[in-house]
């Protein structure tokens, strides 16, 4: 995936969705350009 930042926290950018994939163990997210940024990086 594409790296993105929630403040100073690096995450993975998911285009075209407003929710993080639930099976990857993400603990947080923030809204991002046309999608969502989910962290921590897996």
From Swiss-Prot:
Pfam families, per database record: Defensin_4
Gene Ontology molecular functions: ion channel inhibitor activity; sodium channel regulator activity; toxin activity
One GO term describing the cellular component: nematocyst
SUPFAM superfamilies on file: Defensin-like
Compartments, record wording: Secreted; Nematocyst
Keywords, sorted A to Z: Disulfide bond, Ion channel impairing toxin, Nematocyst, Neurotoxin, Secreted, Toxin, Voltage-gated sodium channel impairing toxin
Other remarks in the entry: Negative results: has no effect on Nav1.5, Nav1.7 and Nav1.8 sodium channels and on Kv1.1, Kv1.2, Kv1.3, Kv1.4, Kv1.5, Kv1.6, Kv2.1, Kv3.1, Kv4.2, Kv4.3, Kv7.2, Kv7.4, Kv11.1/KCNH2/ERG1, and Shaker potassium channels.
Its biological purpose: Binds to voltage-gated sodium channels (Nav), and slows down the inactivation of mammalian Nav1.2/SCN2A, Nav1.3/SCN3A Nav1.4/SCN4A, Nav1.6/SCN8A, insect DmNav1 and BgNav1 channels, and arachnid VdNav1 channel. This toxin acts by binding to site 3 of sodium channels.
Protein name, per record: Delta-actitoxin-Ael2d
